[in-house]
Swiss-Prot record:
Organism: Photorhabdus laumondii subsp. laumondii (strain DSM 15139 / CIP 105565 / TT01) (Photorhabdus luminescens subsp. laumondii)
Chain's gene name: rlmB
Protein name: 23S rRNA (guanosine-2'-O-)-methyltransferase RlmB
Pfam families named in the record: SpoU_methylase, SpoU_sub_bind
Similarity comment: Belongs to the class IV-like SAM-binding methyltransferase superfamily. RNA methyltransferase TrmH family. RlmB subfamily.
Gene3D superfamilies, per database record: 3.30.1330.30, 3.40.1280.10
Length: 244
């Protein structure tokens, strides 16, 4: 069993973290640049034979996505399950988690993972039945974060939120109708930030399991932000508070 990853950042991140997963690497024939060449040399240093391919073949493998001239066939990475949560929580003193409810676009999933990694989030939690897959597109957008941030798929998100609360983790949901903003909220302790789908927001049951609802103040003419942008705004307000 194998999967495809593509893009310089995604391939480089896997090489740095889990090089034994590589099976085959394909590079665009005739392409040489200052970012790709060192990566090729690094792959060759672990014994990988680089296979050359034309652009049409690479485009077909990635269904027309921007592959930056490199794709790799790799062994699947570790799949985190909900029963991994207790061990993960036991390893950190002040858990900082991100929960995505209904984010179905792999570009948004990848962007949220990238922001989560930059913000120091310990894990991202998503439901099995209402979420984008961590496919090659999401990994490319994540720019390596898919290899560093545990992505935990859960069967029942409401049950998982209850579990987090049993571990004294404050569950903070985002909703436009919240009576206070994230800048008025205390985001310094053990917490899980819950982001809903763009437009629809969190599902009713998810919302009911939040300890607190916050909003992002909007002063312009648009009514909402892209979910990955909103996630970044909220995460880095938490980072600001937690580092002050």
């Amino acid at each position: 069993m194998s999967e495809i990853i593509y893009g310089i950042h995604a391939v480089k991140a896997l090489l740095e973290r889990d090089p034994q997963r590589f099976i085959e690497v394909y590079v665009l024939k005739g392409r040489e640049d200052r970012r790709l060449t060192p990566l090729i040399h690094a792959l060759e240093s672990i014994g990988m034979t680089i296979q050359l391919a034309n652009r049409q073949w690479l485009d077909n493998q990635t269904e027309g996505a921007v592959h930056q001239g490199i794709i790799a066939k790799v062994k699947p990475g570790r799949q985190y399950q909900e029963n991994d949560l207790p061990d993960l929580l036991a390893q950190v003193e002040t858990p900082f988690l991100l929960v995505l409810d209904g984010v179905t676009d792999p570009h948004n999933l990848g962007a949220c993972l990238r922001s989560a990694d930059a913000a120091g989030v310990h894990a991202v939690i998503i439901p099995r039945d209402r979420s984008a897959q961590l496919n090659a597109t999401a990994k490319k957008v994540a720019c390596g974060a898919a290899e560093s941030v545990p992505l935990i798929r859960v069967t029942n998100l409401a049950r998982t939120l209850r579990l987090l609360q049993e571990y004294n983790i404050w569950v903070v949901g985002t909703a436009g109708e919240a009576d206070h903003t994230l800048y008025q909220s205390k985001l310094t302790g053990p917490m899980a930030l819950v982001m809903g789908a763009e437009g629809e927001g969190m599902r009713r049951l998810t919302r009911e399991h939040c300890d607190e609802l916050i909003s992002i103040p909007m002063v312009g003419s648009v009514s909402s932000l892209n979910v990955s942008v909103a996630t970044g705004v909220c995460l880095f307000e938490a980072v600001r508070q937690r580092s002050s």
